[in-house]
Amino acid sequence: RIRLKAIGGGGGKGQRILDAPVHYKGSAAKKLNQAVKPVAPMLREVLSEVKATGRGDNKNVLAEINIETVRHLEIQVIGNGDWCTTLGGRDCSVQMNEQKLLEVSVTVEELAEAIERTGNKAARKTLETDLKMLKEMEEEASRFGGAVGLDSVSTFECIIDRDSHYFMEMN
């Protein structure tokens, strides 16, 4: 399946999911190119509506492989141009119609404490995976902010699909 969304923003409004099987070998870009061909007529119908949701002058549309069961995490970063560090993360997965309803702050320390307290093996495994990913995302956000010379506060956004995370955008 393919998700179409306005590059210029829109806060999730106007996004469309198109059914297009993506079972091709090769890079993600090649997969998207091959998957879009069968649905080209349908694309024309939805592009104008998706473009209309974009803010500013950028009316371009992004097509990406849709991840069905997804969580949305944000990491706050701060830098002065010479260094960059993280200020913690927020789970923004509670959404309705692609709009955040609730943001829950979570720290590495809180996850570690929850792992120690739980007696449920399945819950423990999930928490351990979450802790590992949160640490990785914080390290990546700090490295990325430092690499671009971040001289302010920013948000490093990721999506999580089971045990993998993917950089989405930095605001």
Briefly describe each language-model feature range:
Residues R16-P21, I78-N80, L87, V104-V106, ...:
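Short beta-strand-to-turn element immediately C-terminal to the catalytic PLP-Schiff-base lysine
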Residues P38-C92, E136, T155, I159-Y166:
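Phosphate-binding site of ATP-dependent enzymes
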Residues G9, K13, Q95-L101, Y166-N171:
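Short acidic (Asp/Glu) and glycine-rich catalytic loops that position anionic groups and cofactors
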Residues I2-R3, D19-E68, Q99-D130, E138-G149:
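Conserved ATP-binding module of the ATP-grasp superfamily
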Residues S152:
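Bilobed periplasmic-binding protein-like "clamshell/Venus-flytrap" ligand-binding domains
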Residues R1-Q15:
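A conserved helix-loop-beta module that forms one wall/lid of the active-site cleft
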